């Protein structure tokens, strides 16, 4: 399946149905009075997170979503049917932005979470609603209120427990393929990975999700190479696994290059727990391995793991280290609750916050 992490979508909720102007007509009843029913509500536009999706590719082929209008009211005090809702199915981790691409509407981080993006218009009142003691036969009714329409941006930030970062050809995809069932493209040239890949790793009967993103190079925060556009996919991770290839001539400089790009990107990426590993060590002899390990330790300020996806050396140890950090981070954070939104119990204000209540029919 092709990967797409950003999409522009046009949405429109349904208009409310018009109220009816009708009078009771029955034999032997001379003044039956008004019996026009109210119009039905227009349909809403919702967004909902579902399991099994990790791309927004479906929104490349369909960008317009419109709910149906409410049915007009009818005689005999019959209220029109409400319009049908439309629901956008998105992956967990999707953020919804206004057309300016900066104003956040909602951040959907839990499976099954729903949010109303556009409320349908209320139905108009029928003439029976306007009957008074001084006006027994009103001959007017309200039209339905129009629905809402807007253009929004969907932006996906994948949900993973650990993120793999490093220079191109640092062995990130090989690591992912060796510890999970993911099958990313692997080749001996830079930027083989063009989009993020996810895999589920298992260690000591515990599972966690790994995210592999395209490699970073110097100047990535300024758009050099693929740039830093995929770093958003590791913003939600608990821990970063920073891989430095043993084939680099200067492993300390390679580490600092990626670290600088993470700092330039911001969003607290450098505040996340970091595990550093010297990868592809099968290409070194013991003397060279000792030298480069010492150089990398000096650059990162900690003892790096020594791993090889080819021979399996050090793989179990680094997976256990990742697991321990993830367990610790999860224990410190309270579990998220799926917000329960009742029908029409939220109005989106200018600040994007929900307020109880519903629009009253004029």
From Swiss-Prot:
Chain positions covered by the region annotation Disordered: 332-362
Pfam families, A to Z: GTP1_OBG (PF01018), MMR_HSR1 (PF01926)
Residue ranges occupied by any Obg domain in the UniProt entry: 1-159
Residues annotated as domain OBG-type G: 160-327
Key word Ribosomal protein present: no
Record: residues binding GTP: 166-173, 191-195, 212-215, 279-282, 308-310
GO CC aspect terms: cytoplasm
An individual GO BP term: ribosome biogenesis
Top-level division of the source organism's lineage: Bacteria
Residues reported in the UniProt entry to bind Mg(2+): 173, 193
Keywords from the named record: Cytoplasm, GTP-binding, Hydrolase, Magnesium, Metal-binding, Nucleotide-binding
Cofactor dependency: Mg(2+)
Record text on subunit structure and interactions: Monomer.
Protein's UniProt name: GTPase Obg
Species name: Rhizobium etli (strain CIAT 652)
Gene that this sequence comes from: obg
């Amino acid at each position: 399946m092709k990967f797409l992490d950003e999409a522009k979508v046009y949405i429109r909720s349904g208009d409310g149905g018009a109220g009816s102007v009708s009078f009771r007509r029955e034999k032997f009843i001379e003044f039956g009075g008004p019996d026009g029913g109210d119009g039905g509500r227009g349909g809403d536009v919702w967004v909902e997170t579902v399991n099994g999706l990790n791309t927004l590719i479906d929104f490349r082929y369909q960008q317009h979503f419109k709910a149906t209008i409410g049915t007009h009211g009818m005689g005999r005090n019959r209220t029109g049917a409400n319009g049908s809702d439309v629901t956008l199915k998105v992956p967990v981790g999707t953020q919804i932005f206004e057309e300016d691409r900066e104003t956040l509407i909602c951040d959907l981080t839990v499976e099954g979470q729903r949010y109303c993006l556009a409320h349908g218009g209320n139905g108009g009142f029928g003439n029976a609603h306007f009957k008074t003691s001084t006006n027994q036969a009103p001959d007017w009714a309200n039209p339905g209120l129009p629905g809402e329409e807007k253009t929004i941006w969907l932006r996906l930030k994948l949900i993973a427990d650990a993120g793999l970062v490093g220079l191109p050809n640092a062995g990130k995809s090989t690591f992912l393929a060796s510890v999970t069932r993911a099958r990313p493209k692997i080749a001996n040239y830079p930027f083989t990975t063009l989009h993020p890949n996810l895999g589920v790793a298992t260690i000591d009967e515990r599972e966690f999700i790994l995210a592999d993103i395209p490699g970073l190079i110097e100047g990535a925060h300024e758009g050099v190479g693929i740039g830093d556009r995929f770093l958003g996919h590791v913003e939600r991770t608990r821990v970063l696994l920073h891989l430095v290839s043993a084939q680099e001539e200067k492993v300390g400089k390679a580490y600092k290059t990626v670290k600088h790009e993470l700092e330039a990107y911001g969003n607290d990426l450098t505040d996340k727990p970091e595990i550093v590993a010297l990868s592809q060590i099968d290409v070194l002899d013991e003397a060279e391995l000792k030298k480069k390990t010492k150089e990398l330790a000096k650059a990162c300020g900690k003892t790096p793991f020594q791993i090889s996806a080819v021979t399996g050396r050090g793989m179990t140890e680094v997976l256990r280290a990742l697991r321990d950090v993830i367990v610790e981070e999860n224990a410190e954070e309270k579990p998220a609750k799926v917000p329960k939104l009742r029908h029409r119990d939220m109005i989106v204000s200018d600040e994007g916050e929900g307020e109880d209540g519903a629009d009253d029919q004029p």
